[in-house]
Amino acid sequence: MKSLLRYFILFIGLILAGCSSDKVKVGLLIHSLDKERWQSDQKYFIESVNELGGKVLVAVADNDDQKQLQQAQDLLKRKIRTLVIIPVNQYSAAEIVDLAHNHSVPVISYDRLINNSRVDYYVSTDNIKIGELQAQYMTQLVPKGNYALIGGSEYDNNSRMLFLGQMNILQPYIERGEINLVYRKFTKYWSEDEGYQMAKECLAQNNNQINAIIAGNDAIAYGVLRALKENGLEKKVAVAGMDADLRNVREIVKGNQVMTVYKPIKTMASTAAEIAVKLARGEEIDGCNTRVSNGKRLVPSVLLEALPVNKDNIEQTVIAEGYLKAQDVYQ
């Protein structure tokens, strides 16, 4: 009887050991958690990896690219099998990719493409299309007048993609003399304070004669709204953003912001999680729908479609998707 019990305990131990070894470690490097949307990305990514039987090791760089490099080194020492990066800097993060590859660890660039690197996969939305969605909505609402573009970080490839999309729509209006692009600048950190300061500068330079402002994201847009309010221009200037942050969707309900763009964050995060775990287990990757050039290679990519959000479709978009709750939006 004791012999049978001993073999039974040994058998259970082997099963548990096998389960433990299958719980692959995935590293997640996040540039910052200062905006609510990145907190959602982190939450959904961790949940998805856990459901797939993996474990996530997270490090947040607080917008410091050297700190992010050090964090990558630390995670690699902890024997991660795949590294997912939301880069602080789209250029300097190439060093992290090389470092990971030296440890035979594949890298997924999440939402922001790492340029001039051998990054293995890219998961994001079509940011050119997002820029087009912003500009299409604005030109339908404000087909003539003075426009300002306050873009995202100068270090982020997404900012350039958004601008290209915006200009695809705006350029014909500009050439016909219907729209004047009187202000265009990129921020450093996609921040509310930068949006506020640049909007103040834009208004001062143009004697408050601005008809539309397209912001790189909702944090920037919120800063723009602050500047407009200070100058008595609430609801007089059309403002667009991106990310469908709760406070901005509330401003859309109030009529202060005209639209935002919602990225399907839950799907993005779960897609990245699935690829990360498959890479860690040496499984075949499928589902990539395009390849995107980063200056060094055509990166196998999954680009998801974003949704424009305005006061008429909030319930059919961000609420239906489960991203925001009706009781939070309609206070």
Language-model regions, residue ranges each:
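Sec-dependent signal peptide recognition
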Residues: 2-10
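C-terminal motif of bacterial Sec signal peptides marking the signal peptidase cleavage site
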Residues: 16-18
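Periplasmic-binding protein-like
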Residues: 27-29, 79-87, 106-110, 148-151, ...
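Hinge/beta->alpha junction and helix N-cap segments in small-molecule ligand-binding domains
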Residues: 29-42, 58-67, 88-89, 112, ...
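Hinge/cleft segment of the Venus flytrap/periplasmic-binding protein
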Residues: 154-158, 170-171, 271, 275-331
